[in-house]
Curated annotation (Swiss-Prot):
Annotated protein name in UniProt: 5'-3' exoribonuclease 2
UniProt tissue specificity: Expressed in roots, leaves, stems and flowers.
Residue ranges, compositional bias (Basic and acidic residues): 415-433, 918-928, 950-962
Keyword Acetylation: no
Species classification: Eukaryota, Viridiplantae, Streptophyta, Embryophyta, Tracheophyta
Gene name of this polypeptide: XRN2
GO cellular component: nucleus
Zinc finger (CCHC-type): 264-281
Amino acid sequence: MGVPSFYRWLIQRYPLTIQEVIEEEPLEVNGGGVTIPIDSSKPNPNGYEYDNLYLDMNGIIHPCFHPEDKPSPTTFTEVFQCMFDYIDRLFVMVRPRKLLFMAIDGVAPRAKMNQQRARRFRAAKDAAEAAAEEEQLREEFEREGKKLPPKVDSQVFDSNVITPGTEFMATLSFALRYYIHVRLNSDPGWKNIKVILSDANVPGEGEHKIMSYIRCNKNHPGYNPNTHHCLYGLDADLIMLSLATHEIHFSILREVVFFPGEEGKCFLCGQEGHRAADCEGKIKRKTGEMLDNTEADVVVKKPYEFVNIWILREYLEHDMQIPGAKKNLDRLIDDFIFICFFVGNDFLPHMPTLEIREGAIELLMSVYKNKFRSAKKYLTDSSKLNLRNVERFIKAVGMYENQIFQKRAQVQQRQSERFRRDKARDKARDNARDNAQASRQFSGKLVQLDSLDEVSDSLHSSPSRKYLRLSLDDNIGVANVETENSLKAEELDNEEDLKFKLKKLLRDKGDGFRSGNGEQDKVKLNKVGWRERYYEEKFAAKSVEEMEQIRRDVVLKYTEGLCWIMHYYYHGVCSWNWFYPYHYAPFASDLKGLEKLDIKFELGSPFKPFNQLLAVLPSASAHALPECYRSLMTNPDSPIADFYPADFEIDMNGKRYSWQGISKLPFVEEKRLLEAAAQVEKSLTNEEIRRNSALFDMLFVVASHPLGELIRSLNSRTNNLSNEERATIIEKIDPGLSDGMNGYIASCGGDSQPSCFCSTVEGMEDVLTNQVICAIYKLPEDIRGSEITHQIPRLAIPKKTISLVDLKSGGLLWHEDGDKRRAPPKVIKIKRYNPEGSISGGRLGKASHRLVLQTINAQPDYMNINSEPALCPNTVFQNERVPKKIPTFKDNGIQWISPPPSQITPKKMNSPQRQKAWKKDETPQSREKSKKLKSSLKVNPLKMKKTKSPQREFTREKKKENITPQRKLTKAQRQVKHIRMMEEAKMIKQRKKEKYLRKKAKYAQGAPPKTA
């Protein structure tokens, strides 16, 4: 599930990490009747070639259970077909050249089971409430005479079957094996790659199985450090896991989730209130624009984007670095991953001090840089925590708790008041609308149609979908068919209205503000004594001594959790049985004395799949288990019946929405559960025993692949052994034959290369000439090598693209922003200092404007300054005095033109288009005057008498004061001087002309121009 809102925070703070995916579309020929698939063996259109593609399959299974771009499936076959199309699209986007790794969630560590249990119990509770509300709405519709289509039975009515050990997950594993065989045998883009399938019978979460593969391969001989990885998944913690690998060339592929200003809208029609899966183009039908078949078949695809980890590393290098401190990027990244654990993770409850929507990450980073890292110490060393430094860091964070709680109370108070005002306004508007409708009903007229033609026209022109297409000339059979279609359309409309009302009802019910069912805040974190009230309400502490004892144990377990998560992210599970035994977390200021804690873990072993189902599923999902297990969940006399309460408390814990509440379920006692399961395990069938077993990853390659010969030779040596014995005999993989992949292979049970691979998906054809061979794949040993990226040999580090200018600063921290809204992020700009006394920016612009106006006002009298305001709206010169005549210099002369004031704009005052427009307004007298003036200037420009402006006269007088007295020249001397100046000017002009002609002749002969 990951960290809520973390991805939104990431793309807002580090926007350049996001790259839009460029997709090719299949080519349609013969008018769209035939579609030519995309050749994935061709270069990637995104300009970046990937070696390995990793699929977190649960991020594919869930969207295919509840798709947004099509109606929900009703059978497993429809789900599988949707998944195959989904994987095809992802494969074409990325086009891996070496490996495709599909990882399905297996049995999770006990620390994750608590969250899975709460989520599945909550889903069952919400489904029961939704079913009850839907039944009431159906009865209401029936009383109103609105017909609804009957309910459709579905195999996928319960999404809780997406859990290891269920029949669905076993069927899915075989369906994916069939899909892999089909693609490797037929698709040219798959021909040279290896495919690894880690299904639900392999213990571990899907994303962590992927990280184990990368981690175990990277430090072995033969591994290429420049391998380009791409990981698909929806969980936000995939970003943390990718950073933890310290692999440079890493991207995450995911759907575009957030559209600015369009959250919660259907992306097909852009309307709110429904998903794209439920969209039937109602908006078009309401306006009478009925969709034809071709329009209805068009599917709008959701866009995708890459999150480039190497860009994120550059951002963090700038954002986490302390000026003057020694730079170690990998350790800074490790510390960043660790501090993000405090704002949310899948294994520990949320700390009440820190909310990511309240700028918690900015606060943590600010404390890290300004108050902690100034000591030049780190919080982590790979997977190990320096608890002394962690305590110092979190103590500095805890100093802001009072300010955070005060600000949070102010924000909640404002939201509550605003909602009450909005609710009162909406109620008044609804009352006014009802009164208006009532008045129209009493004052309306009865419209009588004179003919059947008018009846037909009114029916066909109705904007609603609920109309009857009857033609008076059609026969009775066609009329009956169209009547039946219209009735069916009416039922679909009613069903759509039912879904809309149900969704709105459930949304309002789950909103504490709208429903008015918000719980009273008994802790009151903004008032004195909040710590004592917190432990009294949440942990049932009855005395000061008991509160202190509980606090110490909570701090111990929470610190154990931090250490467990850090090890899990960097080196895998350190204990399968450890879990946090409380529903609530401590405050940041409670984490004291961490250095004295003795923290140790025992590895243990994972649950069996059926035991995990008993631990996480509610009794409403007992159908997902074998028959012999169901009574343990549904029978009141079961020894573990107390694990499955019919109802349970949901603590809103100060939150607004019900989904944010904490499900206070009893924790499962492992010993009691395993003892109860052992009593019924003997009744399992062979197929159920297989579903309840821990299996291995499977490797698939084309028989012509270099690994194909290795698999065949291994199979020939183990043909006479049992399946259990064959799995124990392993062969080391030569990385030279496998594009740098290390590990071991073992023979799989049965035929590793059947000549015909039978279809396991209904309606799909068998693979008749199979060329794919498979084997068991086992990871190599986890060699913990150097995590310092720049020390890895042969590593090609991408060119730097991020600078300080690209960083965004949040300004004030959330709790420091007083009672105002938080200021938007601002771009950090490098400060440039101007010389003393100079002006720039806005001051320079205003000064320039004043200078232009002064110059215009100081023009000679013949310019005839207009005292009327200019008629040029939307310009900076609005209501300023402008000249009626503006000089334009052409051919060493002056042409006076008179533009209309409405055409004067501040841009391109002398452009040819503007001059042409002005010439249209000239009079014959003004044109003749301009010609005379121009001809007189051509005869002797020196005879032109210029009128000096006051500013020019003032400047000239000032200059005269500073000039030393000189002997006054006679008239003859002035004429001689003038002649000499004219001759010098003529000579200079002649030299320039000759120089230009020489260059022109030189370039014409092909001589290259001189370079600077």
